[in-house]
Amino acid sequence: MAENKTLKIGIAGSGNGSQGYARALGQVERARVTAAATSNRLAVDLQRTIPGVAIERDVGGLIRRTNVDAIVFADPVVDLPAVIRRALLADKHVLATISSPVTCSQLDELASLARRRQRLLMFTEERSFHPALIFLKWMLSGRSGLWQPRYIRAVSAPGTGNGNNSGPSIAALIVEELAICARLLGENPASVSGVVCRVEAEAMPAAAFVNLLYADGRVASLQASITEAQESRQWALATPSKTVLLDECDIRSPVKIVSLDSETAAGSPLRINPPVPLAEWPSESTVTPPLRSTDTKVDQCRHFVESILNRDLCESNAAFWADVALAWEAVQESVRLEGMPVSINAVSEREKRAVGERPKLRLIRGKGMGTVDARKRPALTLVPR
């Protein structure tokens, strides 16, 4: 695209996510919100803050607009894969939030469609832009074996309390933690096990406990709860000589390193949070991480916009989320088996067989019946009149 190209973006949704992304896009250079499919309340706010923005009654109208290059789906959408497919077929780039689990096969199909249409399909990963998690990922990807964790523990709670329906579901929380864990370690586990607990027998799950076992022996334990009154997003990564503690909700000192080596008194925490650029952080042995104040929504939007303008379609994370979805499907199977470990490879092979099997197209003619292979799924039955 031309260097002075401005990306015209449409916003779909009426919740806080859409409002937040509309404001974030206003802070990104070479990006302009030109249309939105939203409620009257948010429409009034957008028209007040973004002069000239067009308002559509539904997502279909937004997708059909010729003055929209990309669409952001930041709020829960009914049948998200179908809506994304419509947008890609209309040659729109897509940034979407996975508010409820999407299957591995659906994500694979969408990724393939995006490649064929030469459009960028990206799913939001706001927490991956958190400066503390960026530091942690950088530290774990270093050459020093000192920072290779043998055990990881994550605790997540949105702080909605009482398991009400105003916040994310247990499924959404676990899927998000699976994604962060995959980003930190750079791979999917070999096997998983999971259990859920309910306050009442017929109630939705109030908490979940998931264990991940990796091929090299590393173990990760993920815990999620929707019954706690206080928000919590904490990580603990244990190495042979140090434990890294990360609290995403701690603004002052999100990262602490508890060292057990001779240089530090046993068990004493090193609180680290000077806001310095990554390039100025001299080595892994120091305790000064590259933390800086940031707006994760703005960073997410900037990454999306710059990838499109640079025609860098390889920045799509659809394949990554397909791997996360595969791990989630294994967790679901383990829950159905009351916590028994489930192999990721076994789930993957079943997924491939299910996708590869073609159903039969049954053509009924009078009293006769014949079958031929169908090219589309699901199977069709035709009855001539």
Model segments located where?
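Glycine-centered short loops/turns at secondary-structure junctions
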Residues: 91, 118, 217, 338-339
